[in-house]
């Protein structure tokens, strides 16, 4: 099979017209006109001689590289790019794995052109990414920290939480977050896989990890890592200092006695390309942070893992990005069980049709023994 990609076809080969983005130097604002093609959005329109009426490669690169996040934007209070500023949100395709849908059409055109047998797609999988910003709600904290956190809750009129904390500290009750492994056993009999990302860093304004010096905390995290793949939740502080990121990674590696190859960014503070450059420089091979904190959908418009392309260096990196389409906060925001289930099943069926993986992010708070989580867990 012969294919060409450029301005004009060379002969009777499979021709894909280029719009020029992939040959440009640097990152510059791009004027994008979105149109409808076969019932889905497309952009970077090309000549009628092309097998697809748009530059599939340039459009996919624009979305997957997060080109628009290199352009100056108005950050939220944590310095994050907001979904409302994205092309996907503006043109109502944030909830679509658009690149995967395009690729499905591209493969169909390819096999039809060369009269090839149907392409055998990969098997659809579901994986839970369980974030652990704090292993326990009240256990293993110093009396000083317990006192001031309790005082803070009391000042905000959270009397139930204040009383619950007191009962746990006095050992009249178990911590509400105890028994994570027992809860995860329910998924062992299903086709769902899972992995943990635990915050294990110095206490900070946005990082509420239990003490890294607590022997019991260390033992619990080690037990988790023996049960399922476990990696660090990179601290918020590490987004400002690469030295802190390396300390977090080395500390976690020393704890579980394994090299660290995967990571997730706490608070999902991603700054392109700095965050992913720092991960790559620290030896990280897999990132699980590609999502928006407050909006469900596909931040990079794909559900499939992909190698991150650094636009600043104009090269592909060894870092593989694993996109997440839903998180606990997205599902809970629906409030009612029916709407929760509709949201979950909507994404699930969409990805099953494309044989694409589905990654859902939870926190260990999902399995809080004192919360009314039965409806939410039933959705999963």
Over which residues does each language-model region extend?
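Terminal accessory/targeting
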Residues: 1-213, 303-304, 311-380
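Catalytic domains of cell-wall/extracellular-matrix polysaccharide-remodeling enzymes
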Residues: 1, 237-315, 369-373
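Short acidic/histidine-rich active-site segments
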Residues: 232-233, 289-291, 360-365
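Metal-dependent polysaccharide deacetylase catalytic core of the NodB/CE4 family, i.e.
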Residues: 134, 138, 158-162, 185-270, ...
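Conserved hydrophobic/aromatic pocket- or pore-lining residues that grip, position, or stack substrates
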Residues: 131, 233, 279
């Amino acid at each position: 099979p012969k294919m060409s990609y450029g301005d004009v076809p060379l002969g009777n080969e499979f021709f894909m017209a280029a719009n020029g983005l992939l040959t440009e130097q640097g990152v510059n604002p791009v004027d994008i006109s979105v149109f409808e093609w076969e019932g889905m959005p497309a952009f970077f329109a090309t000549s009628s001689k092309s097998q697809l009426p748009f530059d599939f490669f340039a459009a996919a690169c624009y979305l997957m590289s997060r080109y628009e996040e290199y352009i100056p934007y108005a950050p939220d209070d944590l310095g994050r790019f907001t979904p409302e500023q994205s092309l996907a949100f503006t043109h109502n395709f944030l909830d679509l794995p658009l690149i995967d849908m395009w690729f499905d059409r591209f493969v169909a055109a390819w096999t039809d052109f060369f009269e090839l047998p149907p392409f055998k797609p990969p098997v659809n999988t579901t994986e839970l990414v369980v974030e652990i910003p704090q292993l326990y709600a009240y256990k293993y904290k110093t009396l000083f920290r317990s006192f001031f956190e309790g005082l803070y809750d009391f000042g905000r009129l959270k009397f139930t939480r204040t009383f619950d904390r007191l009962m746990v500290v006095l050992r009249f009750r178990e911590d509400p977050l105890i028994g994570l492994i027992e809860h995860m056993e329910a998924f062992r009999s299903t086709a769902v896989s899972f992995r943990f990302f635990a915050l294990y860093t110095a206490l900070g304004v946005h990082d509420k990890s239990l003490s890294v010096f607590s022997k019991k905390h260390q033992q619990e995290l080690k037990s988790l890592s023996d049960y399922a793949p476990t990696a660090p939740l990179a601290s918020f502080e590490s987004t400002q200092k690469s030295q802190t990121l390396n300390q977090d990674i080395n500390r976690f590696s020393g704890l579980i006695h394994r090299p660290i190859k995967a990571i997730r960014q706490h608070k999902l503070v991603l700054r392109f390309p700095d965050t992913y450059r720092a991960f790559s420089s620290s030896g990280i091979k897999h990132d699980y942070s590609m999502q928006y904190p407050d909006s469900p959908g596909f931040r990079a418009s794909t559900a499939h893992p992909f190698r991150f392309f650094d636009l600043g260096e104009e090269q592909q990196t060894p870092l593989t990005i694993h996109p997440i389409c839903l998180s606990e906060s997205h599902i809970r925001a629906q409030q009612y069980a029916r709407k929760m289930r509709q949201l979950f099943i909507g994404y699930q069926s969409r990805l099953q049709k494309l044989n694409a993986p589905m990654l859902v992010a939870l926190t260990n708070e999902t399995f809080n023994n004192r919360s009314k989580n039965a409806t939410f867990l039933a959705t999963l």
